[in-house]
């Protein structure tokens, strides 16, 4: 591949001949002040380069002043602008990637704490010096607390036994319960497993009860070997641990075998579970090595502990409940408003608690100016300071006011068509910028003094009066070009003013309860309880009217005793601008029953910002198992964005569970790191990542290997894109293979735990099987050899340039649907493959082996592309090609069940763009969908006409397979239809959960999930406002419509197939 000069800054990748081990000119700075320039191989290790330099040093002045070579190491400034000392000299120069090719020879440092900071900065993609430079008291306080928290976690690991360490580092994956429909897939009620001893060719198979504990398998294997080898090989079952063949996964503990996810999957897929008996001494050796690293980390941390804070002076403070003055601020001026001098500008301000407006918004006067707009205007809100809730936020919107006649001429710098406008009194208001800030600081002190707020210019859709209460309370870090608002909070002249502490709130509630009887909630009769139940049964999107909210608040004790799940609606009914109601609610919350975790998730939505409510919600989540927490981790990371302060119950909870379970830790790491580039959350996610790394030093090496591999793949993908136009596909593939064979790439991409699944080892690339795909972003198709029993290879796709977060969300929903169906005793053989965003528009996708797209199956069965889509026998014939007899019957059964699952799922989620290249089938019969670029009913259209007219895909070739190729097989089709109806009703019973999970993702910035209106599709598809009978009738109509209009799908597929055949 020829050199590409598109990005001259990336000297380590782009400006190089990737077909050869190119050299680069590096400047070396010696401690004596001598400067030497050498040509060194890009792929050389730091140790080799040091030896090269030392040979040259002899020829330069003042050599005699230098110490021994081992007394020195190199230092550089890395890609995150951090000064990094290169202590690990086995690393290659092209992997170190200095910002410039300059290496400084320095005396070996003895400060291990600085080295750890440097490693953490490289790993999280953000130098820790950036946090120091902020000089933000909240950031510093949080980092100090989290450092103490993480160090305590490390200390707790030191006392673990090796088996507890194994449980923490390689946690077994369990299923919650035993499924009834597994019985027919066992062999006479027995489970068949294969076991072989490590470093031995002996393989033993057993038929055992699925309810046995793993230790019993150890015992059976040892007994069987004793019968062959005799007593010289006698050993105890406790001397071994079962390891899944070819995976970093261990099966141990007290759970029955059938509850281990690996064994469950083997049974469902009718494959043989295969284990290796590993000696415990090998595990203990791994344990001891990590303990050494942990003890070193403890020493590193303790060597650089921050100095203790000086004792605080006792000072008099006041509480806001003693202040009955109206809340007011001074709007001083605005800078860099980016409007013409003649354009008049307003500022609108509103006080919010969640999405609730606490009082009327206030608007400044209209002024115009060139750059600075000076108001010096006092804005007074219709609420007293004493009634301000703790989580009140002040939201600003800056907008230009233009006459309709002058609009066309005056808006060239505002780009009005991009955002919504408000028309009032013959004028048009165009948004310019928005910004939010908290009324209280992270310590609960009422803000005072001058504040400069650097604003954001990107407006989401459907804002209330252009204010964006759901937006971040962080100001724009790119201050140089951002609109700035200068405001002044009133000074507290006598003493600082705080929100009352918890004990004062409870005292106030007790005082109210014992005093005014009007404040005490009453009890409702049967009639009121029936009305209350009807209100509480509504879905989370339903709006409450004023009378309904009053009724819920009045009957709050009935809610607590009879309808504890009503808590979200009670919280929406309280008047948050009334201190008496807030105090009584906090007291009530202390005795409110714990909600099931799935119901408590709703309380983390933006509508519920109160600190104590969110602490209550997190308390409910503590009941979750690790497997259940993993299921909802995507949403829990997203709702961190709703937290106004760094130190909160949710961030501590996630850190605690991640540090207790390395599998959760890996996914938390990647969910955070994939968005650390986003300005609004860069600091928040960055400091949480730092805390995780400090508390999981043993995991850093694994994560660093993954980061290094992904950086290599990103570089390779960029090179392929740059040269795709110049080279033929064959030449491009050859150049890709040449690159992957280079030692630097081979080492970086080998023997790493898959980011998609830490149990899977990506051992060695099958370079000749690797390729890049034809789509615009040239995804990399990578094939690895597999060490797993009965598995030849493992495939992953690396994408760079596509946002995978919407695919992640859709696949998560498919996984949840699969779980809910199984809980109800219905297994629809869903296949939600792995997908993980790992960076800015980049990530990994799992390749499902032995599968083909419907388009390829149809094309391969026909000589003419135009008729391929209409060949109803193609799919059944393809299944017959790989299956016969009983296997064919099982394949058709797999197809029938999975087709039912995906029909219902694609209808409920509104998955669009369903053509024959994003529906696939495994050779075993499982059907599954891929590529979820359009969801929630956002179907593709052309010239205003929807290309997809059916609610879900159900073509006649699918029905042909379901009916086993027999046209009149109504029994099989009737069973398929019944499966679809049962599956739909099961999902509908959990409709509130789906709405909650999508609502929690509103802040993710997904293109098709930007407002509550987008979630309305779910409410409609699940018919949540109707009875079950009405809902089922609606689904039956949709089913008939899909069947009736399936010819339109075939026409679309024909057009797609013809285009595909033409392109190839």
Swiss-Prot record:
Its main location: cytoplasm. GO terms for molecular function: 1-phosphatidylinositol-3-kinase activity; 1-phosphatidylinositol-4,5-bisphosphate 3-kinase activity; ATP binding; insulin receptor substrate binding; protein serine kinase activity. The keyword Lipid metabolism applies. Phosphorylation at Ser-1064 down-regulates lipid kinase activity. Residues 20-109 form the PI3K-ABD domain. Residues 910-918 are annotated as: Catalytic loop. Residues 772-778 are annotated as: G-loop. PROSITE patterns: C2_PI3K, PI3_4_KINASE_1, PI3_4_KINASE_2, PI3_4_KINASE_3, PI3K_ABD, PI3K_RBD, PIK_HELICAL. It is an enzyme of class 2 (transferase). Belongs to the PI3/PI4-kinase family. This is Phosphatidylinositol 4,5-bisphosphate 3-kinase catalytic subunit beta isoform. It comes from Mus musculus (Mouse).
């Amino acid at each position: 591949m020829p050199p590409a000069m598109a990005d001259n800054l990336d000297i380590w990748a782009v400006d190089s001949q990737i077909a050869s081990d190119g050299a680069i000119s590096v400047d070396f700075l010696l401690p004596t002040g001598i400067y030497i320039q050498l040509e060194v191989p890009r792929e050389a290790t730091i140790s080799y380069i040091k030896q090269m330099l030392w040979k040259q040093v002899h020829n330069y002045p003042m050599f005699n002043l230098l110490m021994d070579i081992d007394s020195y190491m190199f230092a550089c400034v890395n890609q995150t602008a951090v000064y990094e000392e290169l202590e690990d000299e086995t690393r290659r120069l092209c992997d170190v990637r200095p910002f410039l090719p300059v290496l400084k020879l320095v005396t070996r440092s003895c400060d291990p704490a600085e080295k750890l900071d440097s490693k953490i900065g490289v790993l999280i993609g953000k130098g820790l010096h950036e946090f120091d430079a902020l000089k933000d008291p909240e950031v510093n306080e949080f980092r100090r607390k989290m450092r103490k928290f993480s160090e305590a976690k490390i200390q707790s690991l030191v006392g673990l036994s090796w088996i507890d360490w194994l449980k923490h580092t390689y946690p077994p994956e369990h299923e919650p319960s035993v499924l009834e429909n597994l019985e027919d897939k066992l062999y006479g009620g027995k489970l068949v497993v294969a076991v072989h001893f490590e470093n031995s060719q002996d393989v033993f198979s057993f038929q055992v009860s699925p309810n046995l504990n793993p230790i019993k398998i150890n015992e059976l294997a040892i007994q069987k070997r004793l019968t062959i080898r005799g007593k010289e090989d006698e050993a105890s079952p406790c001397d071994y641990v079962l390891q899944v063949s070819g995976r970093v996964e261990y099966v141990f503990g007290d759970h029955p075998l059938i509850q281990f996810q690996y064994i469950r999957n083997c049974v469902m897929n009718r494959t043989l579970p295969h284990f290796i008996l590993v000696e415990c001494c090998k595990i203990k050796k791994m344990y001891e090595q990590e303990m050494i690293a942990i003890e070193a980390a403890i020493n590193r941390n303790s060597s650089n502990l921050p100095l203790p804070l000086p004792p605080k002076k006792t000072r008099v403070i006041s509480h806001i409940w003693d202040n009955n003055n109206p809340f007011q601020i001074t709007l001083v001026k605005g800078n860099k408003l980016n409007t013409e001098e003649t354009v008049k500008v307003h500022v609108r301000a509103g006080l919010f608690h969640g999405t609730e407006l606490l009082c009327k918004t206030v608007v400044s006067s209209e002024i115009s100016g060139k750059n600075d707009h000076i108001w010096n205007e006092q804005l007074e809100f219709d609420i007293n300071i004493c009634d301000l809730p703790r989580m009140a936020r002040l939201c600003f919107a800056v907008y230009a006011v233009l006459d309709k006649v002058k609009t066309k001429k005056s808006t060239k710098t505002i780009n009005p068509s991009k955002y919504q406008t408000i028309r009032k009194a013959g004028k048009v208001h165009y948004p310019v910028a928005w910004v939010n800030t908290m009324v209280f600081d992270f310590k609960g002190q009422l803000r005072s003094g001058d504040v400069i707020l650097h604003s954001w210019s990107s407006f989401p859709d459907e804002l209330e009066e252009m204010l964006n209460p759901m937006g971040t309370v962080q100001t724009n870090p790119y201050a140089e070009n951002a609109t700035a608002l200068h405001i002044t909070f009133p000074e507290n002249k006598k003493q600082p003013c705080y929100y009352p502490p918890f004990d004062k709130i409870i005292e106030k509630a007790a005082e109210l309860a014992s005093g005014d009887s009007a404040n005490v909630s009453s009890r409702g009769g049967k009639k009121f309880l029936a009305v209350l139940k009807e209100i509480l049964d509504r879905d989370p999107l339903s709006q409450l009217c004023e009378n309904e909210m009053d009724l819920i608040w009045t009957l709050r004790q009935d809610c607590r005793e009879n309808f504890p799940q009503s808590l979200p609606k009670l919280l929406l009914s309280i008047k948050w601008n009334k201190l008496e109601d807030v105090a009584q609610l906090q007291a009530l919350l202390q005795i409110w029953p714990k909600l099931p975790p799935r119901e408590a998730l709703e309380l983390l939505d933006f509508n519920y910002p109160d600190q104590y409510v969110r602490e209550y919600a997190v308390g409910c989540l503590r009941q979750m198992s690790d497997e259940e927490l993993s299921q909802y981790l995507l949403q829990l990371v997203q709702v961190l964005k709703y937290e106004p302060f760094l130190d909160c119950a949710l961030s501590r909870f996630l850190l605690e569970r991640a540090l207790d379970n390395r599998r959760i830790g890996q996914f938390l790491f990647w969910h955070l790191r994939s968005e650390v580039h986003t300005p609004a959350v860069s600091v928040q996610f960055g400091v949480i990542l730092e805390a995780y790394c400090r508390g999981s030093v043993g995991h850093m090496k694994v994560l660093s290997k993954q980061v290094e591999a992904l950086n290599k793949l990103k570089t390779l993908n960029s090179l392929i894109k740059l040269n795709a136009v110049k080279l033929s596909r064959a030449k491009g593939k050859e150049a890709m293979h040449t690159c992957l064979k280079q030692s630097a790439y081979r080492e970086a991409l080998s023997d790493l735990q898959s980011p998609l699944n830490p149990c899977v080892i990506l051992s060695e690339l099958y370079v000749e099987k690797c390729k890049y795909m034809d789509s615009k972003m040239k995804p990399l198709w990578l094939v690895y050899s597999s060490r797993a029993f009965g598995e030849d290879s493992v495939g992953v796709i690396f994408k760079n340039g596509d946002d995978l977060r919407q695919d992640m969300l859709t696949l998560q929903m498919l996984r949840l649907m699969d779980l809910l169906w199984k809980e109800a005793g219905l297994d629809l053989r869903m296949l939600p493959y792995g997908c993980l965003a790992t960076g800015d528009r980049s990530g990994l996708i799992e390749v499902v082996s032995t599968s083909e797209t419907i388009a390829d199956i149809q094309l391969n069965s026909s000589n003419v592309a135009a008729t391929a889509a209409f060949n109803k026998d193609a799919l059944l014939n393809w299944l017959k090609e790989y299956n016969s007899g009983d296997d064919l019957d099982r394949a058709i059964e797999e197809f029938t069940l999975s087709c039912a699952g995906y029909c219902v799922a694609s209808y409920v989620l509104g998955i669009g763009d369903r053509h024959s290249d994003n529906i696939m089938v495994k050779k075993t019969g499982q059907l599954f969908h891929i590529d979820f670029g359009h969801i929630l009913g956002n179907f593709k259209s052309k010239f205003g006409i929807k290309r997809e007219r059916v609610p879900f895909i159900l073509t006649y070739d699918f029905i042909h397979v379901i009916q086993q190729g027999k046209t009149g097989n109504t029994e099989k089709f009737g069973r398929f239809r019944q499966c679809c109806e049962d599956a739909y009703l099961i999902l509908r019973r959990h409709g509130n959960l789906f709405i909650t999970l999508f609502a929690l993702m509103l802040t993710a910035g997904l293109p098709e999930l930007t407002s509550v209106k987008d979630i309305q599709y779910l409410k409609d598809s699940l018919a949540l406002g109707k009875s079950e009978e009405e809902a089922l009738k609606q689904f039956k109509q949709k089913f008939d419509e899909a069947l009736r209009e399936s010819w339109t799908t075939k026409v679309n597929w024909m057009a797609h197939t013809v285009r595909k055949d033409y392109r190839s």
